[in-house]
Amino acid sequence: IENINEKDVISEIIEIYDTNKMIFVKGGKFNFGSDNGLDREKPEREIIIQSFLIDKNLVTVEDFRGFVNESSYTTEAEIFGNAIVYNDSIDIWQLVDGANWEFPLGKSKKNSSHNHPVTQVSWNDALAYCKFCDKTLPSEVQWEYAASERGQKKNQLFYWGNDLLVNDKYMCNTWNSGYPNTIGFKDGFKYTSPIGHFEANSLGIFDMAGNVWEWCYNWHLPYEGNSQIFPTDLKGKAQRGGSFLCNSNYCHGFRLSARSATSPESSLFHVGFRCVKNITN
C-alpha cells in the first residue's frame, strides 16, 4: 500500500469488517469489457478503479436467514407468492407458486442448504441485505476487476485459463453436458454447490465463475462508445459470473467479461449475490 492516507483508511476498515470474510482489492488500471466478446461486452477500454473490499464468498442461505431473523425482512418472492424456476424436464422457465429463498424449487421440493448461495432473491432483496451489513452490491467494473485478479487475467476466458477442465478437474459449477437434453452435473452438482467447493482465484475469491449469477449494482446498459440498443430481455440490473445452468453450447455467462440482466424485482433459482465495501480516502 503506497499511500499513507489509504493505509490509515484500510486499517480502520479492517478493524470493522471481518477480513476472514472479505478480500481487500487494491485499485488500479485495467481493461474493462472485451472486444472479443458479445456486442454487449464492447468496447474494451482502460478504466481506473479505486480500492474496495469484496466478499470472499457468495452470500449463503445461512447468512440470509440471519438477516431475515434480525430485520424481519420479507423478500419480494414471498410477497408475490412465486418465483422463477427452470424446468429442465420440459425445457421451460416457470413461475412456481411458493418458490422463495428457503424453497428455491417450490414448497413441494427440498429446502435450501445452509452453506449454499442464497437464491430466489431479487436485486431489491440483495441490496437490502447489503445495506443491513453496511455494504453494497458491486458495480460491474468492481466485479470484473476482482474476478480477473485486478485485470491480470483479462487475456483469458476464465481466471484459471481457457478450459473448463484442468487435469480432468472441473474448475466451476456449470452444466457439463449438452444442454438441455443430457444430464449436466459431471462436476457433482445439478443445481447450486456449497460455497468454496471450487478453487478460488489468486485474490482468494470463490465462485466468480458458475454456481449462480451475481447481481451487480448498476443497470445493464451499453458501455460508453457502444451505440447499440439492447433488446427488452437485456434491460434490467446487471448480472455477472454465469451459473450452474451455463454451458458453452448456448451460454456465455461464465467468461470474465460476460454480462446478463434481469428486472430488479425478479427472483430466480440460479441468481444470488455478494457484497462489497467501498473505500474512500
Where are these regions (language model features)?
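General helical structural elements
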Residues: 244, 259, 278-281
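Functional-site microenvironments in short loops/helix caps that host divalent-cation chemistry
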Residues: 25, 31, 36, 74, ...
